[in-house]
Design a protein with these regions (language model features):
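Conserved short submotifs of the Hanks-type protein kinase catalytic core
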Residues: 104-116
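ATP/Mg2+ or Mg2+-diphosphate-binding catalytic cores
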Residues: 309-382
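ATP-binding glycine-rich loop module of kinase domains
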Residues: 41, 45-74, 120-123
């Protein structure tokens, strides 16, 4: 990470200084900016407060989304941090919100330090470190779910309090949604590969898609977070991306983690995915069974998780085929770009293996068909 002096960075710092000075009632001076990267066009900096009232942290992180980015994402991220601030440190999934300005599209957060990311730990060929990191991720999700179940009304109230007049921010809408992808992807699979999706599978997809917006055991979720947006600190797992935080069925979160983590592993470690999947799922269940007693049944758990994984792979497939066409919609703004051909194929292969382990011939058969189609396809763009 390098110290930055570029004008856009200076402007972000000046804006943050003004915001923090108003909040503290005294002059705040920030220095030594470090570029932390960021999703899309966002500027994310670590700064040190060299002139600092006692109440502010000595080191903070500033995030600003430039004009042209999704206003809804900024609003939802602010509300997600406000909501998370109400949780105890043990249950809070990420940094604390220090200050924000909707008008300036700027957020100031506590600094979590320079801990390794989940993706960096998964890339290490150290089975013990990988196992520890994945279990910490699963347990962090479980603790967060238990601490926030039943509080969707509080989150919705925070959204309403911001009083946005020109941006539609539905409290339940974290992404375009699974239901809207079912018919289009059916048509794509039919036209591109002459592949028909079994009606029984469509019914299951429709039922699972509803869980983004209603039903199920609903708790707070930072939304679909990639391993490179997760820090593994000495205090546990901390999630960095809240752009589409909200409430949804808890199974969707563990299923998303199971869907994305294997592509960050080395080839040898991928041979142990079945064991890692089971261990993660069990670590998560040990916490959430208190709020979702039905998941104590192994068959129920396996079916629910498999259906949710199917939904995530279906969504990724839809994004793979459509994201380059629909750059003006919110698909790109959700922070997870369309997967590469190799990553998408890997997700279908993993889904097939999971379906085989569960003994689900419908999902396994469909996955086999899609895998064959993708393997016969020329690479679109890696």
């Amino acid at each position: 990470m390098t110290t930055l002096l570029a004008d856009p960075v200076a402007q972000v710092i000046a804006t943050a200084e003004e915001l923090l000075s108003k909040r503290a009632g005294a002059t705040v001076t920030l220095a030594e900016p470090e570029d932390l990267g960021g999703s899309g066009p966002a500027i994310v900096l670590r700064v040190r407060a060299v002139q600092n009232p006692f109440a502010l942290p000595k080191s903070m992180v500033i995030k600003q989304v430039p004009e042209g980015g999704s206003e809804a994402a900024v609003l939802r991220e602010v509300v997600s941090y406000q909501f998370a601030n109400s949780l105890t440190a043990k249950h809070r999934p990420g940094p604390e919100l220090v200050a924000y300005s909707i008008a300036e599209r700027l957020i100031v957060l506590t600094d979590l330090g320079s801990a390794p990311t989940m993706s960096e730990l998964l890339a290490e060929r150290n089975r013990a470190a990988i196992n520890h990191a994945l279990m910490a991720w699963a347990q962090a999700l479980g603790r967060m779910h238990v601490a926030t179940v039943g509080r969707e009304g509080d989150f919705a109230a925070l959204l309403r309090r911001i009083d946005v007049k020109k941006t539609d921010v539905d409290p339940s809408q974290q992404r375009i949604g699974g239901a809207e992808t079912i018919d289009p992807l059916q048509q794509i699979l039919r036209s591109e590969y002459a592949l028909e999706v079994p009606p029984a599978l469509i019914s299951r997809l429709q039922q699972t898609a509803e869980l983004f917006g209603k039903g199920g055991v609903r708790a707070f979720s930072p939304s679909e977070v990639a391993p490179d947006n997760i820090l593994v600190t000495e205090h546990g797992v901390r999630i960095l991306d809240y752009e589409w935080g909200g409430f949804r069925d808890i199974v969707l979160d563990i299923a998303h983690a199971l869907t994305v983590y294997p592509e960050f592993l080395g080839a040898a470690e991928r041979e142990e995915v079945a064991e890692l999947d089971d261990a993660m799922t069990e670590a998560w269940r040990s916490d959430v069974v208190s709020i979702a007693p039905g998941l104590a049944d192994d068959e129920t758990l396996a079916r629910r998780v498999l259906d949710a994984r199917l939904m995530w792979v279906w969504l990724a497939t839809h994004e793979y085929f459509t994201v380059d066409v629909d750059l003006d919609d919110d698909t790109v703004a959700f922070g997870n770009p369309a997967p590469s051909h190799a990553a998408l194929l890997g997700r279908w292969v993993a889904l097939h293996a999971a379906a085989e382990r569960v003994g689900d011939p419908v999902v396994a058969g469909h996955a086999t068909d899609v895998i064959a189609a993708l393997r016969g396809e020329s690479l679109m763009e890696d």
